[in-house]
Every structure is written in structure tokens, then in C-alpha cells.
């Protein structure tokens, strides 16, 4: 669905200025990413609204996205599956309880330690950056984690540390395995649906 829309947009942009734009493949890839983030954000906001926690869901989504960009992670084969799984994970982590103010610190540090141990993670088909660049991205992630913990303590933005915790958990071997199994489940569902139509 998102891939088709991205392809249509890429062809339209290419038709406007064929000589100065990138290839249709590159444009499609870029549009797919943009559409994925927009669609995910809309779904997160809708689910947050249904749960009466729109601000919490937005915090988790933003923090999770920043951490994901900086530290990598397993990817699904279809962007719509990725969107739905992201919303599912964000919804699940939103139910983690906060017994007291120290829970924010514990969740942030736990997520940070998992990121320290397991990041960066790349799939075989992904571009791997230089070691220098990866160290820089990881440092930025650590700075954001500290900032998110401080903001959680000062401004009650618990969702920021939950996003860090979510990313840390998804980088673990168990998190990667669960993501891969869900990817296979989604793909099998698609094949079954195609056979039935």
C-alpha cells in the first residue's frame, strides 16, 4: 500500500524534472520512508487518543524513532507490517507501570545499557556505516538517553524513557528473534490471503 503510493509519487516527481532528480528507485525508497513515518505517527496518535494517552504515545514514538535511527534494529519486509508492529510495540510498552520517580531512571538506564551492549544492529541488506560514524551515533544516543531521563524527572515525560527501553529490548537477541518471527507470520498471512483470493 505505502510502497505503491511511494512509487506513484516517485514517478510524478521524476516526470516534473527527469534530468535533475534521482532515479525512480531512490525516490521510491525515500518516499516509502517518509510515508511510513507519517502513517505510523497518525496511527500512534489515533491509538493514543483511543487510550486517552496521546501525549504519552507521542513521547514513546518520538524517543523510539530517534533511538532506532541512531542504533539500528531488525526490519520487516513490508513497511505496512513495520508500521503496525511499531504501533503494537508502542502500545504494549505504554502499559509499563511507574511505581515512583525512580522507575523512570531505572527504565532509562536499563534501555541505555541494552543499547550499549547490543547496538548497532543491521540487517544483512542494510548499509553499514564506518566504525567512526557508528561510535558518533552511539554517543548521540547516550546523550539523548541522559536528556530523556532528566526530562522525565523534571517534566513527567515518562514516554521518552519508555521509547529508550523499547528500543533496547528490541535490540536484544530475544527482541530480534520476536521481530523476525512476527515478520514471517505477517508474510505467511499475506501468502495465505493471496491464495484465497
Curated annotation (Swiss-Prot):
TM region(s), chain numbering: 29-49, 79-99, 102-122, 143-163
Gene Ontology molecular function terms on file: peptidase activity
One GO CC annotation: plasma membrane
Protein's cellular compartments: Cell membrane
Function: May be involved in the proteolytic processing of a quorum sensing system signal molecule precursor.
GO biological-process terms attached to the record: proteolysis; quorum sensing
The protein's name: Putative AgrB-like protein
Domain of life: Bacteria
Membrane topology per record: Multi-pass membrane protein
Coiled-coil intervals: none
RNA-binding listed as a keyword: no
EC number(s) recorded for this UniProt protein: 3.4.-.-
UniProt key word Hydrolase: yes
Annotated keywords: Cell membrane, Hydrolase, Membrane, Protease, Quorum sensing, Transmembrane, Transmembrane helix
Homology family: Belongs to the AgrB family.
Source species: Halalkalibacterium halodurans (strain ATCC BAA-125 / DSM 18197 / FERM 7344 / JCM 9153 / C-125)
Pfam short name (any one): AgrB
Enzyme class: hydrolase
Primary subcellular site in the record, as a coarse category: membrane
SMART domains: AgrB (SM00793)
Amino acid at each position: 500500500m505505502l510502497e505503491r503510493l511511494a512509487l506513484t509519487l516517485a514517478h510524478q516527481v521524476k516526470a516534473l524534472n527527469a534530468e535533475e532528480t534521482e532515479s525512480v528507485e531512490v525516490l521510491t525508497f525515500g518516499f516509502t520512508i517518509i510515508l511510513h513515518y507519517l502513517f505510523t505517527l497518525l496511527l500512534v496518535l489515533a491509538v493514543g487518543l483511543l487510550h486517552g494517552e496521546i501525549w504519552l504515545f507521542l513521547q514513546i514514538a518520538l524517543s523510539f524513532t530517534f533511538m532506532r535511527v541512531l542504533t539500528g534494529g531488525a526490519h520487516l519486509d513490508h513497511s505496512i507490517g513495520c508500521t503496525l508492529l511499531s504501533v503494537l510495540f508502542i502500545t504494549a510498552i505504554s502499559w509499563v507501570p511507574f511505581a515512583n520517580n525512580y522507575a523512570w531512571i531505572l527504565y532509562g538506564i536499563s534501555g541505555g545499557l541494552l543499547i550499549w551492549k547490543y547496538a548497532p544492529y543491521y540487517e544483512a541488506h542494510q548499509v553499514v556505516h564506518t566504525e567512526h560514524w557508528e561510535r558518533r551515533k552511539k554517543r548521540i544516543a547516550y546523550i539523548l538517553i541522559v536528556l530523556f531521563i532528566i526530562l522525565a524527572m523534571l517534566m513527567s515525560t515518562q514516554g521518552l524513557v519508555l521509547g529508550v527501553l523499547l528500543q533496547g529490548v528490541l535490540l536484544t537477541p530475544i527482541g530480534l528473534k520476536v521481530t523476525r518471527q512476527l515478520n514471517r507470520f505477517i508474510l505467511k498471512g499475506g501468502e495465505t490471503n493471496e491464495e484465497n483470493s
